[in-house]
């Protein structure tokens, strides 16, 4: 059988080599999540003896836009057929890689899976995993990879924190910023930083779960006083945005 020459940078390799059944990767933009997922989809499909694999994005069109070209490029030596309309790849061992959209949940039902990638899980309803995809892994103890950039403290965050606790040996979390991709010039990331709010930058490039999309102010717009300097006589005002606090956010 043709041997695939897997090429990954150091941080991608950490995830690729980890043996845990369920891996969660929260990473900044352009880290290389899609390429990592593509290699794992190909390898897992080639190793499967009975079941196929899924790549699931928030929509079918996103799945095709993100993954179709990458898979065909990396897997050209092991792909026997490619069906453009349905976005299904058949490999030389007969196993198939299906590209799916979570917005069409009925197309995800009725199959058993050897391996599964869920991309941008923060943008996918949690019941798609809990009620449809998780049961599909049960009969052959299939594996899953979750990848995405955080979108506040939602179900992606909760699943990440569950893995982070370390109480379930089947789960492992990984956190990377865009700086962890050695193929992206640091100067390019710094250039993007100058035109973004500090909160947006933290979310998109540093993969911060705390950077909610409603936060629009850049940190360097705020001038802090000397904490050791006593205030002068006069009238002072304070404004508090309670929506910015985690406890209030959870109760809202």
What are these regions (language model features)?
Residues 20-88, 157:
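Conserved P-loop
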Residues 60-114, 202, 209:
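Inter-Walker segment of RecA-like/P-loop motor cores
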Residues 62, 123-124, 245:
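Residues immediately C-terminal
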Residues 119-121, 242:
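Walker B catalytic acidic pair
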Residues 123-196:
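ASCE P-loop NTPase helicase motor core
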Residues 181-247:
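ATPase catalytic-site recognition across NTP-hydrolyzing enzymes
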């Amino acid at each position: 059988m043709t041997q695939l020459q897997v090429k990954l940078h150091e941080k991608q390799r950490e995830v690729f080599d980890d043996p845990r059944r369920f891996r969660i990767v929260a990473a900044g933009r352009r880290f290389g999540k899609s390429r990592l997922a593509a290699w794992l989809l190909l390898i897992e499909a080639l190793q499967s003896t009975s079941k196929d694999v899924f790549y699931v994005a928030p929509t079918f069109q996103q799945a095709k836009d993100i993954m179709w070209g990458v898979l065909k490029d990396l897997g050209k030596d092991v792909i026997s057929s490619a069906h453009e309309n349905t976005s299904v790849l058949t490999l030389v061992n007969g196993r198939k890689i299906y590209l799916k959209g979570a917005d069409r949940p009925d197309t995800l039902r009725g199959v058993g899976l050897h391996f599964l990638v869920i991309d941008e899980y923060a943008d996918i309803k949690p019941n798609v995993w809990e009620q449809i995809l998780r049961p599909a892994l049960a009969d052959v103890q299939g594996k899953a990879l979750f990848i995405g950039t955080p979108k506040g403290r939602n179900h992606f965050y909760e699943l990440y924190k569950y893995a982070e606790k370390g109480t379930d040996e089947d789960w492992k979390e990984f956190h990377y910023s865009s700086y962890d991709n050695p193929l992206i010039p640091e100067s390019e990331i710094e250039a993007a930083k100058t035109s973004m709010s500090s909160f947006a930058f933290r979310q998109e490039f540093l993969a911060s779960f705390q950077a909610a999309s409603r936060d629009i102010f850049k940190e360097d717009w705020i001038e802090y006083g000397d904490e050791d300097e006593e205030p002068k006589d006069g009238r002072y005002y304070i404004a508090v945005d309670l929506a910015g606090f985690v406890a209030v956010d959870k109760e809202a």
